[in-house]
Amino acid sequence: MTPDPITIDPQTTLPEAGRLMKECNIRRLPVVENGRLVGIVTLGDIREASPSNATSLSIYELNYLISRLTIGEIMTRDPISITSDTSIEAAARLMLERKIGSLPVVDADKVVGIITESDIFRLLVTEGEIRPTFA
């Protein structure tokens, strides 16, 4: 788990969120409003919301439109979350069942961490037993 993750608010623009993800080398950002988790946005969400290269708009028109798009418009609302006392196994099962790559960790309505696929893999590789084959 990453404790005290970087969060953004719904009014953050698409370019701002993209820059933050790039600068911090992260792919997911919990979205917090008035101290409460209201959504999550991924790098995939940002890419999907970005215009295609095949557009007929000029670069100036594109930049204008993108600069006005907020995270609140593209985020996944009310994301599935866990508490800090949730077991790693339960978190991994939930991620697998729901086909999601991360879970915000929330205690007393406050985002205290985020667990990602990478955290699960890291734990498995460094502390768990890895079977030599899938058979």
Model-derived features: positions:
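The conserved cystathionine-beta-synthase
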Residues: 8-25, 31-33, 73-75, 81-99, ...
